[in-house]
């Protein structure tokens, strides 16, 4: 198979949702169809101990939430599928946003009983900004939920995206009978031994079923007033195909997968800092680090840099340029993933996600190139933290473990580190409280370093140029610090303190991140 043919087989997507909409469950079902797991059952399993395949970190298993992005790969129907299962919890939106830079499409999972929720809306905005295709899975049809027409209306009114239903539920909850498959013009049956029936057979099966009559009325209404199906509009991110189903009972998931793979885009190009796009079929290898994860195997205390291959082909042992440091690195120990299990990989192509063992060489956002190519891709989004805590080692004898843990967790992008210019104190910044809890848990369990954390409350953060730096600017209301890249930054007590500073030092430019 040629390189071009291999690249065209790739389908790389992220699954986004509000917490508890069923994102991890549908991930398990997709892996089941891909032959990667033998059974897919109730995913959370807090009481039973049946943990989700993609929730591998200890704290995720304890709390039943996804706090890191898992990467999984399988083959199905002639396609090589790369799934990125993103954190649903809002405190981990940084990791999710960066992950969304590494995919070509997104699957949006919505709880049909609740409709569009806050986190779904946030994540959709990021996807919309990138103009990548969105495929919607309306989940939990095995329970009573909202009317299907209301759910479609919500997509258009709240998210501002046109929708096209690929299938339509026949009843729901205890009265759920199956799906009327508009795209394939057939019925998918929830009960009985047969999976599918023709529309003519459906008229006989559900002759006296009031829900079936309602379905036919809804479909007639949609054919007259609904949006037209357009593959072009889907690929441009202007139209979302909507699939109904139940991930928990594995109903409608396989149909979704098969249809998704038919319409999901091939790998796309990526912009360099000069605005030029590097295309997947370019023969020279290039990629970027979108995530770093420490301790995926606690026995070995390892670090993995997750790389999205943008162009060309990876071959084991190849040397790459790291433009940020002007140095080169050899890619000899590289893996691909199925959540916590992994295997060595000898080659991979544009669209694939690979894991590079990292001894501290890489940072999130790094570009990897080969030969004389030493360009950089556009930077990944960075986020301004909102709440802060001072942190120190509880046991002075554990300073080495303490510093190693902080260094690795900060490089992951899981939390941000600031150092007080005058006192040298460490301060952690996060977008939500859960990040601090996870940091503390991981420091104690993965690095054997207990920590003392003292709240500093909310701060307004602004960066300044090193040329404008004057330590006399610092006060109790605006703490002068440096970030992990040694860039000077002020932590203002509130917006009033920020305005006061701006008035006093009008020539100092204050910069804000996302």
Curated annotation (Swiss-Prot):
- Coarse class of the protein's main subcellular location: cytoplasm
A GO CC annotation given for this chain: cytosol
Q: What's a BP term from Gene Ontology annotated to this protein? A: regulation of translational termination
Q: Which UniProt keywords apply?
A: Cytoplasm, GTP-binding, Nucleotide-binding, Protein biosynthesis
Sites binding GTP sit at 17-24, 85-89, 139-142
Task: Output the InterPro entries linked to this UniProt entry.
Answer: EF-G-like_DII, EFG_III/V, G_TR_CS, P-loop_NTPase, PrfC, RF3_C, RF3_dom_3_sf, RF3_GTP-bd
Does the UniProt entry include the keyword GTP-binding?
Answer: yes
Name the chain's protein: Peptide chain release factor 3
Q: Which organism is it from?
A: Streptococcus sanguinis (strain SK36)
């Amino acid at each position: 198979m040629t390189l071009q043919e291999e690249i065209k087989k790739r389908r790389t997507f992220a699954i986004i949702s509000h917490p508890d909409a069923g994102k991890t469950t549908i991930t398990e079902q997709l892996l089941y169809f891909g032959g990667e797991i033998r059974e897919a059952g109730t995913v959370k399993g807090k009481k039973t101990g049946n943990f989700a395949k993609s929730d591998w970190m200890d704290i995720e298993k304890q709390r039943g939430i996804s706090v890191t992005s898992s990467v999984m790969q399988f083959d199905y129907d002639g396609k090589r599928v790369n799934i990125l299962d993103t954190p649903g919890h809002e405190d981990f939106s940084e990791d999710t946003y960066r992950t969304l830079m590494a995919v070509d499409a997104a699957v949006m999972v919505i709880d049909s009983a609740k409709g569009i929720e806050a986190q779904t809306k946030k994540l959709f905005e990021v996807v919309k900004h990138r103009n990548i295709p969105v495929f919607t899975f309306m989940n939990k049809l095995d329970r009573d939920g909202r009317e299907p027409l209301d759910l479609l209306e919500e997509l258009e009114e709240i998210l501002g995206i046109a929708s096209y239903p690929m299938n339509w539920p026949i009843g729901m909850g205890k009265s759920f009978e199956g799906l009327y498959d508009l795209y394939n013009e057939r019925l998918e049956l929830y009960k009985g031994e047969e999976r599918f029936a023709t529309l003519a057979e459906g008229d006989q099966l559900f002759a006296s079923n009031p829900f079936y009559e309602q379905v036919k009325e809804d479909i007639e209404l949609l054919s007259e007033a609904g949006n037209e199906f357009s593959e072009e509009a889907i690929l441009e991110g202007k139209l979302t195909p909507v699939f109904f189903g139940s991930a928990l009972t594995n109903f409608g998931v396989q149909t979704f997968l098969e249809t998704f793979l038919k319409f999901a885009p091939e790998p796309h190009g990526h912009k360099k800092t000069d605005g030029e796009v590097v295309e997947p079929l370019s023969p020279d290898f290039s990629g970027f680090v979108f995530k770093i994860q420490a301790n995926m195997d606690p026995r070995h205390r390892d670090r993995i840099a997750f790389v999205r291959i943008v162009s060309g082909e990876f071959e084991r042992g190849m040397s790459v340029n790291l433009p940020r440091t002007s140095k080169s690195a050899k890619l000899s120990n590289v893996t691909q993933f199925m959540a916590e299990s992994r295997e060595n990989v000898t080659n991979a192509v544009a669209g694939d996600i690979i894991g590079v063992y990292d001894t501290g060489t890489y940072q999130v956002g790094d570009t990897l190139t080969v030969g004389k190519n030493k360009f950089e891709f556009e930077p990944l989004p960075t986020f301004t933290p909102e709440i802060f805590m001072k942190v120190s080692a509880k046991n002075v004898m554990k300073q080495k473990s303490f510093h190693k843990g902080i260094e690795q967790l900060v490089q992951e992008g899981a939390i941000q580190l600031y150092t007080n210019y005058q006192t040298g104190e460490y301060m952690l910044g996060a977008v939500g409280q859960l990040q601090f809890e996870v940091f503390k848990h991981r420091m104690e369990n993965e690095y054997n370093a207990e920590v003392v954390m003292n709240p500093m409350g909310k701060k307004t953060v602004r960066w300044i140029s090193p040329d404008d730096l004057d330590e006399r600017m610092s006060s109790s209301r605006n703490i002068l610090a440096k970030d992990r890249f040694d860039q000077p930054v002020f932590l203002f007590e509130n917006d009033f303190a920020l305005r006061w500073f701006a008035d006093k030092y009008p020539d100092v430019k204050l910069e804000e991140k996302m």
